[in-house]
Amino acid sequence: MSDTELYREAEQRLWRHVGASPTERTVELSNGASVRVQELGDGPPFVLLHGGSICGTSWCTLAAALEGVRCILVDRPGCGLSDPIPDGPLRNLPAVKRHADGFLVDLLDALELDSTAVGSTSYGGYFAFRGTATAPERVSRIVEYSWLIGAPSDSVPLASRLAALPGTKDLMVRMPMSRWAVKEALRQFGLGRAMDAGTFDDEMIDWAHALMRHTDTLRNDVLSSPDVITPIRGQNTELLLTDALLSKLEMPVLFLWGADDPNGGEAVARAFAPRLPDAELVVIPEAEHAPWLDDLDTCVERTRQFLLGEDADV
């Protein structure tokens, strides 16, 4: 079997495991790159942008539970089964910013969506917020699931600190990722409690390992991702979202933020959310970086109420 077939086999096992069967299609961006999207459910569209070095299937448990919503799970360029970024990897922060500024609108054009709600997490939040600021009329609402790149950090996972060392990124993408290494990386970035509780279970770990082993997701995304921290100056302040940019996001924004997110927890959330014109913050106790894995019921209920109105049947 080819690498793509081996990856698809693991992905299909995961979807069966969560009891869902998404449809799949590819759309073409203006630069000619093909982007894979999976769709699940009926209702108003909800475009979901995943975090770093992962793909759209990372939303599987949330999407399977969001009744009344048409979830559109996107593999960002270079991730999952989407084409790499044309002329990538992106080697400097200005190039990353240009890519983030243009991707969301380009994607919505390809999806033929004039306006939609957007959900995001981590690196996906950087794309969601910067892209929305570029064309706010295209986004009706945003749900941000915990900390996003562009927000301040009050702590930095060990993997991020190591990645900031010169030459480390190139080394990381050359090393084979064992199942154990995948688990440890996920734990570092804030999925430890979900793994310990079994909400990120063996089928999900097998899928994540297959993604690292049988696709170029890790290489493509690591080499095109900005440094959240720098070896000398600490947090990369040039990456932070400015008040001027955030002021352009006048649509309702819901933050479902893990209180114990190792990238930036409750204190960061309470300082960051009020910087947006119309933001609601829900801090989820004992949740980490992927709050829908730690407390699915709360994330589903709050998301449906926010997208469908207070009368949503929860």
Features from the language model and the residues they span:
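Acidic catalytic loop of the alpha/beta-hydrolase fold
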Residues: 260-264
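Alpha/beta-hydrolase fold catalytic core
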Residues: 1-46, 67-69, 88, 113-114, ...
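Conserved alpha/beta-hydrolase catalytic His-Asp/Glu region
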Residues: 153-157, 176-247
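Conserved HGGG/HGGXW glycine-rich cap/lid loop of the alpha/beta-hydrolase fold
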Residues: 33-84
